[in-house]
């Protein structure tokens, strides 16, 4: 979920005096661990270990405003799994996961290949640590998996690099999970999605999960956004209407654009306030 180049503005308050932060930075090979990174914040929310003090501090600030954020992130991951299983069950055997984020349990290639043996997956992310972790999976014998380093704001490069591993004359599922909300309006997210889908074969799919403020107290939502203003990428919650426009030219699968916990229609009730909208559109 970090397919974007960063422009850090905020440093962990203890960065200059915290011995742990200095030790972590040395261990990370010079990587800046004093600026919160959206991939590592997400990893922290999922209970992962690939995060540093600044990421945990930022995540804690978000949790103080939106206490159900950890559950919402896990539900987003579960939504990803349901979507990949559904698409593989429909016969799609090629997946392009843009802004894939740090590897965790049940990664896209594992889910896709369990449901559809022979499925090919390309992971695309800008963050070099994410890319290094993903490539480490290949070293452990993962087959049909490729990793490219690319910025979501450069969709032409993503397609060119992914095209070395995927056959775009056949259906491809483009996965944009918890990534488009890190694009500002100036980045023209709708145009980026249009380019990513422009040359897809009929029967291809685009799946999106996107942060929204529709179910959040406005003041708390703004406070949480401020945390990301100082991280590696700002977060831009959008309304259902704005997110729906990402699917222009596509045919939305039932139940349409909805709370991720309600997709598919047989999914369980949310249990937490609305945080992410999600949906799947097909290329006619």
Predicted feature descriptions by range:
Residues 1-150, 154-156, 160-168, 197:
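Rossmann-like AdoMet
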Residues 217-233:
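Short, glycine-/aromatic-enriched active-site segment of Class I SAM-dependent methyltransferases
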Residues 256, 261-284:
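Core SAM-dependent methyltransferase catalytic element
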Residues 233-257:
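Short alpha-helix
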Residues 152-153, 162-191, 196:
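A short SAM/SAH-binding and catalytic strip from SAM-dependent methyltransferases
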Residues 1, 186, 220:
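Anion-recognition interface
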Residues 146, 172-176, 192-211:
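Conserved beta-strand signature within the Rossmann-like core of class I S-adenosyl-L-methionine
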Residues 179-182, 211-216:
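Short "lid" loop at the C-terminus of a central beta-strand within the Rossmann-like core
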């Amino acid at each position: 979920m970090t397919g974007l180049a960063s422009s850090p503005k905020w440093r962990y308050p203890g960065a200059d005096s915290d011995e742990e932060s200095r030790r972590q930075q040395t261990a990370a090979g010079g990587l800046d661990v004093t600026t919160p990174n959206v991939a590592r914040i997400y990893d922290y929310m999922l209970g992962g270990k690939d995060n540093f003090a600044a990421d945990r501090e930022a995540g804690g600030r978000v949790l103080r405003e939106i206490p159900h954020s950890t559950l919402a992130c896990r539900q987003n991951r579960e939504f990803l799994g349901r979507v990949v299983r559904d698409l593989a069950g429909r016969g799609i055997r090629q997946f392009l996961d843009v802004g894939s984020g740090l590897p965790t349990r049940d990664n896209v290639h594992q889910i896709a290949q369990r449901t559809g043996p022979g499925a090919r997956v390309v992971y695309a992310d800008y963050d070099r640590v994410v890319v290094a972790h993903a490539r480490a999976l290949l070293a452990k014998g993962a087959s049909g998996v490729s990793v490219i380093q690319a910025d979501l704001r450069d969709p032409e490069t993503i397609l060119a690099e992914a095209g070395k591993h995927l056959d775009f004359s056949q259906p491809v599922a483009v996965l944009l999970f918890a990534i488009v909300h890190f694009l500002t309006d100036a980045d023209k997210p709708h145009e980026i999605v249009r380019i990513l889908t422009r040359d897809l074969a009929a029967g291809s799919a685009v799946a999106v999960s996107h942060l929204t403020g529709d179910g959040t107290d406005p003041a708390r939502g703004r406070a949480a956004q401020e945390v990301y203003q100082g991280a590696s990428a700002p977060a831009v919650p959008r309304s259902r209407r704005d997110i729906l426009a990402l699917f222009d030219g596509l045919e939305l699968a039932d139940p349409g654009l909805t709370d991720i916990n309600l997709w598919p229609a047989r999914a369980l009730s949310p249990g937490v306030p609305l945080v992410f909208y999600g949906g799947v559109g097909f290329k006619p």
